[in-house]
Regions:
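Bacterial N-terminal signal peptides
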Residues: 1-7
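Long, amphipathic, charge-rich alpha-helical segments that form helical bundles/coiled-coils
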Residues: 92-106
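Long, amphipathic alpha-helical surface segments
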Residues: 10-41, 51-87, 105-155
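Short, His- and charge-rich active-site/binding loops that engage polyanionic ligands
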Residues: 45
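Short, highly charged
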Residues: 48
Length: 155
């Protein structure tokens, strides 16, 4: 399994620390920021750290969120996804992070969720199988899944 080595230098955690010293939710935020990066106006309809603009939202084409705005939006979205899976306790953040990237529809039909429902904790292969974009396997998505499962999965 991959060793997670993200340096944490946010204002809340001023000294450099290992990501593994942080709460699960904060780990997920850092991982998403690392892999999504702050989207530019050309990435429309995505803003911030991968938020897909929904009908009725006040974002307009060509807008660029500040880091603070993007961070707040990421935390709001991730909290919403984690809440969808709150009945899974310690796994809610892992499932929320997957839903943030793939969507809750994909997670709800996934082998990962089915295994966790029946108490099977052997989810590595199932979790890391979510590495396709437009039908093609992507190494970047695989690395993201390795990082997520290493930092967010509590055996």
């Amino acid at each position: 399994m991959a060793l997670v080595t993200l340096a944490v230098t946010t204002p809340a955690f001023a000294a450099k620390r290992s990501i593994m010293e942080l709460p699960l939710f904060e780990r997920a935020v850092l991982i998403i920021k690392k892999f999504e990066t702050l989207h530019k106006p050309r990435h429309w309809p995505y803003v911030g750290y991968g938020h897909q603009v929904q009908p009725g939202e006040h974002y307009r084409r060509g807008c660029q969120l500040t880091e603070a705005q993007a961070d707040a939006l990421l935390r709001k979205d991730l909290a919403k996804f984690c809440a969808l899976y709150s009945q899974y306790g310690k796994d809610s953040v892992l499932l929320g992070a997957l839903a943030y990237n793939c969507g809750p529809g994909v997670v709800n039909k996934s082998t990962v969720l089915k295994k966790l429902k029946r108490g099977d904790r052997n989810i590595f292969k199932s979790y890391t199988s979510h590495c396709r974009y437009k039908g093609k396997w992507h190494k970047g998505l695989y690395n993201r899944r390795l990082t997520e499962i290493a930092a967010l999965f509590v055996p």
